Amino acid sequence: MRKTLAVAVSLILLTGCSTSTPEASDGKMAQLTPPASCEQEIVIQAFADQVNGSRYVPTDWQPSPGTDLFDVYEAGGIACTYGIQVAEIGGTVMWASNVDNLWDRKKTEWLEQGQVQIDLPGINETDAVILKEGSTSADEMHVWAINLLINDVWIQVGATFLQNVDEALPIVQSAIDSLS
């Protein structure tokens, strides 16, 4: 009886010491990667929940050097637009692995451009910066964007219809959930 109790207690204690973070076979933490395709149902649904009728909008990107889009593609990432194309309402989500310290280089640029550090509520990100809420460009179009680093993947969410962090969180979470 004592032996059985000792084994049971040991198993309970060992189970309590385990982690839910996946590990690779070599004992290192498993690396998450950006999605390979833009047709991420969870992301499409997150946009549709805020802008009824949203869908993935195939886009023929022509990235210019020095832009976030260019850097995403250089890092082997993808950029995807979701929304209602004819109404010109929607947003773009970009994913890229943090290769060659990409995040630190980009973060320096973003801070110099006026983005500010933020801690996203309910998200366990490594780092995040946001384009100030309610920013407008020269033509008065509303602009809102957030950049975050999570599990060594850079995610950028930008949209014309978002006004604040709370509105963006479901889309941000869907972008995180699409990592594999």
In which residue ranges do the predicted regions lie?
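N-terminal export and membrane-targeting signals
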Residues: 1-11
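C-terminal motif of bacterial Sec signal peptides marking the signal peptidase cleavage site
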Residues: 13-16
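N-terminal "mature-domain start" segment
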Residues: 18-74
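Second-shell loop/turn segments in exported
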Residues: 32-33, 90-97, 157-162
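Soluble non-cytosolic domains of exported or imported proteins
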Residues: 37-41, 100-101, 162-166
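Short Gly/Thr-rich strand-loop-strand
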Residues: 60, 103-145
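A short acidic-to-branched-hydrophobic micro-motif
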Residues: 79-101
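Extracellularly exposed regions in secreted/surface proteins, prominently low-complexity, repeat-rich
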Residues: 131-180
